[in-house]
């Protein structure tokens, strides 16, 4: 049987000879479908229900086969609302898994789980599609070299460097700058690495998805005039969608990222916001399919589902997918099975701090809480490792002295501690940086700081060479030369005022 892609239902191929079944049971988003003997669809096949509801409205629902029940029946999970479906309706077996558009045509566009554009900008070129279910790259295809993925953001590159082809957890509450950090990373990978990004919105608020899209257009990450010049493709399966869509939208985004890596041989950034919602959707589907729940009501297949997704995110000889995943921690309980399973896959964590955001230090990355497995002398080199450790020690000592300063004041500290505090405050400010994507809001041009420049700057602060400069000279600058130039300007300004 020949498969010919169709444009009627993006993301699904139809067969010239249709294999028809009928709905025998509907329980929420789960359908049981009876097929003729010997015509059973395979697991993960896409089924399409077309017809009219009782009000005469056209229905077009795509489902994915999850279980073969026996007696020629299969159980499938719907990718959209099942309102209006009735028993006895015809179901078409497409004979293949869900497939979505991939390649340059996806840039600057917003898709749903089926690969259908939802941004009202017309159809997408569906000549190149790819199934969302694939096996992870084989061992021989993997690139095992440990290399740093330079982001151009000082605090990240120095204290919690990302691994090329690694997975990073992004922790932070509302309003501490997650979105701006994400957009800056998208911008920097495009400029410094010639790479592209894919953003998977998994089970988050529709408003946030809309805000992100608008901000991307405003900051130039998405180019409305010429979509091909955009740096990102967006895939959304929001909170209000059925669990099937939320469970699979991460795979849709990953499939688009894999094409850029394997065929275009690019470095790709894959954002998943939020990985917890992927687990949550899997838990809902698992219960609907009648599986026995495991700890805290999660699905028994939790580790398998997480592993299947995460193992496809890796570096191969062709290119890399570096993934940044926002992690929601339910009730701040890090031992909850969902975040605990996620942590096992992470190479680095970037923790955003409300305290730093309140001080106006952006990016508000917590230098002491953020960690990385890459921060080892044999990987990053002795100079980088030593500088990072000394920066952390200085900041840690400053934290310990905060209580004494609050009660007794700075004058009660020893000479050595006062020097530590002065340097720590300079370091804290030097960890801030103007972003390219924030130019439109702040008016100050963004800065990309290379790793060597970052290390040089912090070494100079730690050595005491810059002790005479005022701490505000280090705030929102790029490299250390800009800080010294800013100090000279501040000095001249103060003289003029006098």
Curated annotation (Swiss-Prot):
Species name: Gossypium barbadense (Sea Island cotton)
Domain of life: Eukaryota
E.C. designation(s): 7.1.2.2
PANTHER family cross-referenced by the UniProt entry: ATP SYNTHASE (PTHR15184), ATP SYNTHASE SUBUNIT BETA, MITOCHONDRIAL (PTHR15184:SF71)
Membrane topology classification: Peripheral membrane protein
Gene3D superfamilies referenced in this protein's UniProt entry, alphabetically: 2.40.10.170, Bovine Mitochondrial F1-atpase, Atp Synthase Beta Chain, Chain D, domain 3, P-loop containing nucleotide triphosphate hydrolases
Lineage per the UniProt record: Eukaryota, Viridiplantae, Streptophyta, Embryophyta, Tracheophyta
Protein name, per record: ATP synthase subunit beta, chloroplastic
GO biological process, any: proton motive force-driven mitochondrial ATP synthesis
Signal peptide location: none
Family to which this protein belongs: Belongs to the ATPase alpha/beta chains family.
Main location: plastid
Ubl conjugation recorded as keyword: no
Physiological role: Produces ATP from ADP in the presence of a proton gradient across the membrane. The catalytic sites are hosted primarily by the beta subunits.
GO cellular component, as recorded: chloroplast thylakoid membrane; mitochondrion; proton-transporting ATP synthase complex
Keywords: ATP synthesis, ATP-binding, CF(1), Chloroplast, Hydrogen ion transport, Ion transport, Membrane, Nucleotide-binding, Plastid, Thylakoid, Translocase, Transport
GO MF assignments: ATP binding; ATP hydrolysis activity; proton-transporting ATP synthase activity, rotational mechanism
